[in-house]
Structure formats: structure tokens, C-alpha cells
């Protein structure tokens, strides 16, 4: 299976080419190769810009019933640039880097179905281990999502997200390795606009976590099958500045409540929140 993809957002441009064999030599193990180029422009909000080009390969297989293990390796060349708004510490991280990481992914999937899930849970843990790295950054990510039908045609979802990034050698992690909460994890806030600041720049943290609760309202638009309306409550935080602990004075939990709309189209779901 060959897939080429170009993704453009407000801050990123990503192009990738992926080759996947879902049943390599009838072993029930998938093998994949990925080549990608990624540009992330955070000059306005965070004072830096990064260009990353590299490749990765790995395998994924079912270890036990509903338990999947993924093993892989990523290598990439990265160039980090800063602008005049960046602090002296940020500017010191500008330069060129070559990194290689080993990846481990553990996935326990008890959902009743992958598309429009209504029952079960999904538990996922991943770790990136540095092999060749100037900063020796170790990244851990854990996501747990629980689905339940509280009453007829209702789907209630609870999700927990936690991520950390720290250097094994007590160095400062790179600007591009610092953690930001995705907009989908803390709706109502600008993506990346939460957590520690260095001057006027949001610089991300060494740690991030969030809790999301969402429940559908089937009484609204009951005759439209491809649109779901729901209420949500999000709460999250980003904290930790390894290169200057005095900057971590924005260590506060943010929260939001609102209405979400999911439109299930042929090209995938489209979401909006108010």
C-alpha cells in the first residue's frame, strides 16, 4: 500500500510518502516505511521555526487479543531558526541537528468499532528513546479514551491525555521537542496558546495533560444521521521549563465548556466547537 500526503495548517506544512505491507510474508505483522518533510513556523507565537526531513520504518503486530505492539525507528535532520523576539536561551538552540530515536507503542483496543465508536475503551502508551541525539530527549505519551452509551442513541466519551519530554542527560530539550496542548484537547483556546511564556512567546512545556468529557445530544437533529451535536468539558495544563524554571509562573489549569458539532463526510469527520 502506497500513500502520499500533503497536509497544510496555519503553522505547519507536511509532506510524506508512506509504504505499508499489512501482512508481511503472511506473518500477520505489518511493515511500514515513511519518508517525510515537515516545516513548523512558530515565529509569531513562539519565536522559532523548524524544518525537519527524515525517514522511519517499523512493524506492528497483535501480541494478544486486542493488544498491539509497535516497534520502529525514526531518523531526521532538523534546522531550527529563531527571530529577534526569541530570548537569549532560545537563540542558543538555533542550529542544525541529526537525531535517531527508537519507538515503542503499546495499544489495547476494546472498542466495539473504530468508526463512530459507542462502547469500550482505547488505551495507548508510546515512548521515544534517543539513540543519536545532542539533547538525549525521552518522550512519553499516554492516552486513554472510554466510550459509553448512557441512554438510547447517546454516546458519552471520557478521555485522558498525558505527555512528558525530558533529557536523560539533564540537558535542555530542543524548542521543537517542547510540548503544546493540541486544540482538540483544550477547545476554546488558541492551539499552543497555553502554558509557560518567555517574554511574549508561548514556549510549551516539559509536561502536558488534559481531561475531556463529551456527551452527545441525540434529541438535536435526530433525523440527520451524519451529524452529531454534543456538549463538552475540557480541562488541561502545560508546565515545566527546563532551561529557566523562573518562567514557569503560568502553571494553571485551564478549562472550557461548550457545544461541539461532528459532521461525518466521505473524506472523514469535520469538527467545530462553540
Region locations from a protein language model:
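Flexible, surface-exposed loop regions and adjacent strand-edge segments
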Residues: 49-53, 86-93, 143, 173-181, ...
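Extracytoplasmic gating/loop element in the C-terminal half of outer-membrane beta-barrel translocons
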Residues: 153-232, 240
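C-terminal beta-signal and terminal closure region of outer-membrane beta-barrel proteins
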Residues: 242-274
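Hydrophobic, well-ordered secondary-structure elements that form the walls
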Residues: 19, 144, 160, 213, ...
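Outer-membrane beta-barrel and related beta-rich outer-membrane complex signature
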Residues: 45, 79-85, 168-178, 241-245
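Gram-negative/organellar outer-membrane beta-barrel architecture
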Residues: 1-124, 137-138, 148-158, 182-206, ...
Amino acid at each position: 500500500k502506497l500513500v502520499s500526503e500533503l497536509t497544510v495548517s496555519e503553522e505547519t506544512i507536511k509532506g510524506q510518502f508512506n509504504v505499508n505491507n499489512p501482512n508481511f510474508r503472511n506473518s500477520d505483522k505489518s511493515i511500514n516505511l515513511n519518508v517525510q518533510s515537515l516545516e513548523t513556523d512558530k515565529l509569531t507565537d513562539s519565536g522559532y521555526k523548524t524544518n525537519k526531513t527524515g525517514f522511519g520504518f517499523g512493524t506492528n503486530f497483535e501480541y494478544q487479543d486486542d493488544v498491539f505492539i509497535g516497534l520502529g525507528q525514526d531518523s531526521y535532520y532538523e534546522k531550527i531558526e529563531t527571530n529577534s523576539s526569541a530570548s537569549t536561551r532560545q537563540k542558543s538552540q538555533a542550529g542544525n541537528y541529526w537525531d535517531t530515536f527508537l519507538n515503542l507503542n503499546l495499544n489495547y483496543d476494546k472498542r466495539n468499532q473504530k468508526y463512530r465508536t459507542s462502547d469500550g475503551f482505547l488505551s495507548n502508551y508510546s515512548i521515544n528513546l534517543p539513540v543519536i541525539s545532542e539533547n538525549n530527549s525521552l518522550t512519553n505519551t499516554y492516552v486513554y479514551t472510554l466510550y459509553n452509551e448512557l441512554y438510547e442513541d447517546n454516546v458519552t466519551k471520557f478521555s485522558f491525555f498525558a505527555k512528558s519530554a525530558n533529557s536523560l542527560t539533564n540537558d535542555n530539550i530542543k524548542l521543537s521537542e517542547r510540548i503544546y496542548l493540541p486544540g482538540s484537547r483544550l477547545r476554546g483556546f488558541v492551539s499552543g496558546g497555553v502554558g509557560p511564556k518567555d517574554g511574549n512567546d508561548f514556549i510549551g512545556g516539559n509536561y502536558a495533560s488534559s481531561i475531556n468529557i463529551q456527551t452527545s445530544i441525540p434529541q438535536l437533529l435526530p433525523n440527520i444521521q451524519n451529524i452529531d451535536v454534543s456538549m463538552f468539558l475540557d480541562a488541561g495544563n502545560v508546565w515545566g521549563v527546563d532551561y529557566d524554571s523562573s518562567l514557569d509562573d503560568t502553571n494553571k489549569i485551564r478549562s472550557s465548556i461548550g457545544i461541539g458539532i461532528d459532521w461525518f463526510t466521505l473524506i472523514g469527520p469535520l469538527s467545530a466547537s462553540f
